[in-house]
């Protein structure tokens, strides 16, 4: 137990170390921060009824993610980007003891500690705990739902109403954090009920089912209010998203790609290995060394298990895998590492099935490879995390080409530290009322937001007004030795200041030039807020 406690403390350290400085702040995070800052300053009425958009669609998710961010902002009385990432950090940390409790439903205490310890130090779990994004807490809420759901069928638990309430709340929150959980969790639940239909009357009467549904409706109340006000606009977007999500590839191509990406990402979760080339080897190793053996053993244990509750644990593990694998087939060409956040604990569960099988064989010789494999998983993830931290630290000194920052498309090493150093420089350098800035679309909003936190009035350089005095700065990647700006020829570069991977160029319009004829139009939000609701 002491070793497990030490592992958990190490996992917390790896999630929280340099949390402020090394926080990822991109376009989505700045957009969300601006919304929460507005709510913190103006009151609860400015909380939105819907959450962020589901990637690549016009569908808005539920607002749970924003409400968690607002709670953090209210408690700390700050809309600083690090504060808004605290909920994701907290839920990532809490998922460790939760996974331990979940594992104890089937495994011994010792095996539960081993597997939860390996999960705690998973590189991908650490990386996604260190910034704010709506999918990041999926692993916690999926686990919480499965744990509460199993407790409803656990004969040793007397007070089941609380677990029905928790199951309903966690189901609702998880389905609001990512579109795919909205599709998979209902499927898993319904199929589980079909296999357990004989025990439903015993453990779930109609009153308990209504309580479960009532908790879901409660969390979805803002979404329902929005649909009433907008006459079902988001529902229309939901059906449009279902039609648009599938790719234009054939079914066979999608299945092959699904197998490949599942294998590659499974291998990534277990080992932290990131191949520089698009190799099939990690996928092959994952499928034949981990996924297929784990799935077959889960089925074998299910057939042999006499304890009805443990059978349910194994059934849920199998359904967890099958539901996500099958639902990912139509979108297999769009799969990214973040799609594995709802399943982040599952590879370690499968490792547990394999390790348990060999460990319980009569010959002790099998225990040696089991220990060796578990050690490789542990060391691999720790080393992968070390290399990632090394990349971020290097980006504070020079332009870099990161390999391990697999969070978003932009792999440039830019973190909050770069923006804050740039803001400090601009505040010292500029003595004028306005700061005109230019940056790529990925960093336009983050730059403005961080400058606003430093009490500077930042506007797009494209909104330059000849009659208003201001300072001009363009932001670019140090490695590219360039910056994003239309009509560059109409500006003189006065100086440039490097902050590791980020370079800030001080500009000045050439005399007699009018750089822009039209300003940058601010996008008008179509969001509905609680202040807009009139009963």
What is the predicted function of each stretch?
Residues 367-429, 438-454, 534:
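Membrane-proximal, lumen/periplasm-facing interface regions of secretory-pathway glyco-
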Residues 9, 86-107, 144, 148, ...:
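Transmembrane-helix motifs of polytopic, lipid-linked glycan transferases
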Residues 33-45, 67-68, 173, 182-304, ...:
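Transmembrane-lumen/periplasm boundary regions of multi-pass, lipid-linked membrane glycan transferases
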Residues 89, 128-129, 138, 183, ...:
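Hydrophobic/aromatic-rich transmembrane helices and adjacent perimembrane loops
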Residues 163-178, 190, 217-218, 325:
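Membrane-interface alpha helices of multi-pass inner-membrane proteins
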Residues 105-110, 145-164, 174:
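Membrane-interface transmembrane helices that cradle and orient dolichyl/undecaprenyl
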Residues 85, 124-135:
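Short acidic/glycine- and proline-prone juxtamembrane loop motifs at membrane-interface regions
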Residues 14-18, 30-60, 64-67, 71-75, ...:
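Extracytosolic helix-loop segments that constitute the early lumenal/periplasmic catalytic or substrate-binding loops
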């Amino acid at each position: 137990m002491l070793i497990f406690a030490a592992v958990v403390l190490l996992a917390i350290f790896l999630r929280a170390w340099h949390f402020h400085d090394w926080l990822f702040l991109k376009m989505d995070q700045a957009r969300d921060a601006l919304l929460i800052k507005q709510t913190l300053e103006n009151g609860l009425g400015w909380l939105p009824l819907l959450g962020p958009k589901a990637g690549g669609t016009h569908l808005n998710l539920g607002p749970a993610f924003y409400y968690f961010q607002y709670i953090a902002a209210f408690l700390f009385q700050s809309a600083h980007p690090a504060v808004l990432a605290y909920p994701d950090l907290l839920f990532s940390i809490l998922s460790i003891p939760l996974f331990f409790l979940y594992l104890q439903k089937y495994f011994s205490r010792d095996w539960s500690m081993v597997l939860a310890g390996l999960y705690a130090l998973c590189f991908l779990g650490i990386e996604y705990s260190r910034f704010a994004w709506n999918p990041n807490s999926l692993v916690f809420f999926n686990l919480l739902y499965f744990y509460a759901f199993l407790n409803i069928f656990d004969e040793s638990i007397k007070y089941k109403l609380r677990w029905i309430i928790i199951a309903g709340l966690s189901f609702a929150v998880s389905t609001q954090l990512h579109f795919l959980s909205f599709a998979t969790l209902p499927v898993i639940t319904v199929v589980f009920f079909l296999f357990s239909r004989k025990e439903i009357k015993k453990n779930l009467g109609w009153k308990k089912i209504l309580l479960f549904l009532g908790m879901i409706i409660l969390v979805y109340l803002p979404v329902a209010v929005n649909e009433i006000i907008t006459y079902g606009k988001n529902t229309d977007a939901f059906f449009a998203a279902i039609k648009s999500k599938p790719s234009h590839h054939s079914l066979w191509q999608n299945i092959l790609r699904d197998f490949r990406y599942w294998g590659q990402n499974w291998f990534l979760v277990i080992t932290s290995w990131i191949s520089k080339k698009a190799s099939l080897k990690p996928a092959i190793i994952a499928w034949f060394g981990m996924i297929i053996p784990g799935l077959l053993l889960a089925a074998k244990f299910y057939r042999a298990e006499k304890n009805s509750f443990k059978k349910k644990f194994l059934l849920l593990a199998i359904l967890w895998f099958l539901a996500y694998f099958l639902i990912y087939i139509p979108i297999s060409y769009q799969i990214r590492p973040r799609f594995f956040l709802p399943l982040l604990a599952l590879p370690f569960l499968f490792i547990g099935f394999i390790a348990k099988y060999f460990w319980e064989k009569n010959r002790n010789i099998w225990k040696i490879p089991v220990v060796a494999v578990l050690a490789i998983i542990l060391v691999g993830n720790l080393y992968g995390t070390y290399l990632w931290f090394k990349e971020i630290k290097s980006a504070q000194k020079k332009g870099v080409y990161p390999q391990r920052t697999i969070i978003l498309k932009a792999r440039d090493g830019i973190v909050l530290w770069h923006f804050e150093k740039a803001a400090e420089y601009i505040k010292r350098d500029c003595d004028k009322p306005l700061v005109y800035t230019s940056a790529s679309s990925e960093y336009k909003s983050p730059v403005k937001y961080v400058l606003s936190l430093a009490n500077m009035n930042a506007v797009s350089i494209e909104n330059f007004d000849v009659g208003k005095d201001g300072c001009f700065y363009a932001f670019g990647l140090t490695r590219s030795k360039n910056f994003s700006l239309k009509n560059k020829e109409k500006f003189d570069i006065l100086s440039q200041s490097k902050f590791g991977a980020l370079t800030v160029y001080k500009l000045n319009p050439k005399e007699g030039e009018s750089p822009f004829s039209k300003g940058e139009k601010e996008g008008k939000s179509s969001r509905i807020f609680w202040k807009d609701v009139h009963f």
